[in-house]
Amino acid sequence: MTLHDLLLSGHPTTSRIVLPMLVEEYHVGQLWSVAQASKNETGGGEGVEVLVNEPFDETHHVPMPKLQAAGKEFTVGQYTHKVYHLSSKVPGFVRLLAPKGSLEIHEMAWNAYPYCRTIITNPDYMKDNLYIIIESYHAPDNGCTPNIHGLQGRDLSARQVVKIDIANDKVAAKDYKPEWDPCLVASPKAGRNPLPRDKTGEWMNHAKPVMCCYKLVKVWFKWFGLQKRMESFILNVEQRLFLNFHRQVVCWLDNYYDMTMDDIRRLEAEVKEELDRQRTEGQVRGTVATDKDEEQ
């Protein structure tokens, strides 16, 4: 199966993540938070390596097929290519089967905000047998747009929709920190209070400002005897990462509230050097695969 075939097929899962912020704020906040989260996940021989971070257009780092969402086409933005050096961040049964050095995941992203396509592969070991495609669109609504990615036919009928509530969804005990809890953390700079812990998600109907991250995820994993198990594991991990990351984005708002995109590009250059040092030092940090990711 080619990448183009996968983009047009598969069994998609759509996550809708409502946030109490402006779409413009999230543009800066997402990038700031990715840089911070990369530092939190890097150490002890594992973590993030940034290979490329530069603009793309219709002649350089051209995405194929074209970037399209919400009835629009996107032709310019920022291209990144990262390598994730993993071991403890994958399930135990994969570590037993995979040879040393095979647990390196490549992530290529075309960020044409408010749209972004991310492609995750394992070219050295799985080759064309692993693709994770994430297509993200960021809209100024509360998750009410029914089909923002323009799915049709079988894709639309087979789609699973997951609404992630950053205030009330259960967070794994090992992931929880009070400073990453949007029900406890306010933003004095933006003048925003903590979110209510109402169990119903009613806050999403009243939040001002409000926006939604619409994430369409497709997984292709071809490994005899493990396909369904690994595809399920990957989707569970993605939901866990979406929940944790977006709670952090909201709680970190004061850190990036006054920043510009020029500030972000300078920060990314500094973080790249820090990651290169940090990856070879200390202990493994951040998210570690758990048995529950396999069971859910």
Tell me the role of every PLM-derived stretch.
Residues 2-296:
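Eukaryotic helix-grip
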